[in-house]
Amino acid sequence: MKLTSDVVKKISSIKGEPKWMLDFRLKSLEAFNKSSNPNFGPKLDIDYDSINYYKEREEKLTDNWNNISCGVRNLFDDLGVISAEKNYLDGIGAQYDSEVIYHNMNKELKEKNIIFLDTDTALREHPELFKKYFNTLVKYNENKFTALNGAVWSGGTFIYIPPNTHLDRPLQSYFRINSKNMGQFERTIIIVDEDSELHYMEGCTAPT
């Protein structure tokens, strides 16, 4: 799939994003087209036109594993995600290709005003907080890869921990790529306020 402004606009339209986010995506696309592959790390020969940049969700976002199709649910079960949530975690998000399909946290955390959401929901429900911290630590124009992520990002996790708040157990996000030539471009945004503490984990897999 050739990465064009039409692809970027389609992603933003499907997600129902505000204009400032579409503008950010298009600005990132321009930076991507103008930059070369970074010279750090190994030499990478990437065919950008062979990447599938976005796949529309087949599963609706839910906080109940029983609402997810058996095949996908069994996959996450085999990966240990479901049992980890039951036994070790205060909350978990699970992404399948381009979109988060499962997200949940213990009700005790909600009572502490902790925010733990997928990025689309966070942008919709907490727009000012999201915009304040989005693109502040890693800038879209740092290199070609950050620009690419800025243009086509989808999914990921948004966490806000209020002041003087400590979590007893970790939060986790799990990212699964399951489609051929699929690119996964999630964003992780974590804000831990003054005198607070969080243990956060990520996991990711793809077919061998």
Cite the ranges covered by each PLM segment.
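Glycine-rich and polybasic anion-binding loops at the starts of cofactor/ligand-binding domains
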Residues: 1-208
